[in-house]
């Protein structure tokens, strides 16, 4: 598999994952999106833990599609 093919597959996976969080299709993931998604996955995180996740993403409380894709690449 070529590097560009692998990158394309990662981009598609990131897009699908982003859409699971951004259920209202705002174009970004905010605190409420993160809270709801984690709860649906059975992860009952505190407000502080959720906020820390957003802070670690280096955002202003909103994770854009592009920022999410960059994070996805680093954790994949």
From Swiss-Prot:
Any GO BP: spindle pole body organization
Annotated ranges, domain EF-hand: 9-44, 43-76
Alphabetical list of InterPro entries matching this protein: Centrin_CML-like, EF-hand-dom_pair, EF_hand_dom
Name assigned to this protein: Uncharacterized calcium-binding protein C1687.14c
CC per GO annotation: centriole; cytosol; mitotic spindle pole body; nucleus
A Pfam family recorded for this sequence: EF-hand_7
GO molecular function, one term: calcium ion binding
The keyword Cytoplasm appears for this protein: yes
Keywords: Calcium, Cytoplasm, Nucleus, Repeat
Localization, UniProt: Cytoplasm; Nucleus
């Amino acid at each position: 598999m070529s590097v560009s093919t692998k990158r394309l597959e990662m981009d598609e996976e990131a897009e699908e994952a982003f859409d699971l969080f951004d259920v209202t299709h705002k174009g970004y993931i905010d605190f409420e999106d993160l809270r709801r998604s984690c709860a649906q996955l059975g992860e009952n995180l505190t407000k502080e833990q959720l906020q820390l996740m957003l802070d670690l993403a280096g955002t202003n409380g909103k994770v854009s599609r592009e920022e999410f894709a960059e994070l996805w690449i680093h954790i994949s």
